[in-house]
């Protein structure tokens, strides 16, 4: 979806390429758009845009489909062993290279008979040996203490917010980089210690670990720097604001990958067959839409995805319905649908709201009783719903190069997102005027932004909230106070 389509006179004649289309500035007020030839792009076309105009949406014939997730890549991102193992291999190769350099330096000095310089190098390496020994003995203790504290912090965050924040920690690049550098420093220090010789005579010594000693000092400095960054990132994970902000940013990233365009305009025809799920049971995490579109085009059929992204599927249940012909060959459908043990935000538009709602519900529970956290979650929920209020939602039609619908994918509609955002929270807010006031303000703001055909669900939740407060709050003045819209709750 393009935002602006205006070019200045000084850019006249320049071409730009992106989003699968090429833009040519032909005057200060008009822009010619021509499609770039791609496997999933439409035929070339040109569009003239009036001055100051914006693209509200683009047809789903030419959008860039989200790249499918690689099961191996996702498995490696969800584990903690791959990065340290890679670090071990890299640091071992680095040690071999440093050893060769040290041997070459000693051999060069002996050929030049520079025994005074060689004696100075031996003295430096002996002084550095004390530092290397200290590093090797203290590094594992340091690693254990740091990550023990970190795991306690993550446990506290998951208990106060939601268990889903553990996934944020596991997939954090800074966490894996810190662990990798710490362990690599420890391993490298052991390798350097094995390179020291007991011989100190410059005429007899074979190797002096000069480069190795310098590298271990560099790794030590990098470890200290990453320790500061890692502690800062872990402390942010314990705060509500940064966690909620990251969930919101990830949700908007998913929203940016969604196709834009009208749906439901082409009738797929009667259902002729179904394809069942034959893999392991799990949550539908990812759909390779490009592969399914190609398979449907070659078979000249229309495929319809039965479960939504985020649904739990078990072997033997139908995942695809075929319209207008026979089932495509199995090898063409292989790896087109991926499942996982839990939901992800890659293609799941509703999962961000699910996480925000979970945090709000945990905050409103009697064991936590933190309405301010619930208000922070409602801030992001209203922000997200305001962003999608005028966007096309629900069923998505994926088309081939000829513009024919080949894959129909059901997604959450406006009413589904509104119910997910407010239904459960509304059941728990009767005793918290701070949250009811923020909820009323959020609903009123969305009523101003939503089109007429989407106001019904908002009005329903607003009326149900009023009924909930009137039913649970006996004093009229308290009811009036609890239903007064306030974007800060009570401030």
Feature locations, PLM:
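Transmembrane alpha-helix detector for multi-pass membrane proteins
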Residues: 90, 94-106, 122-199, 224-231, ...
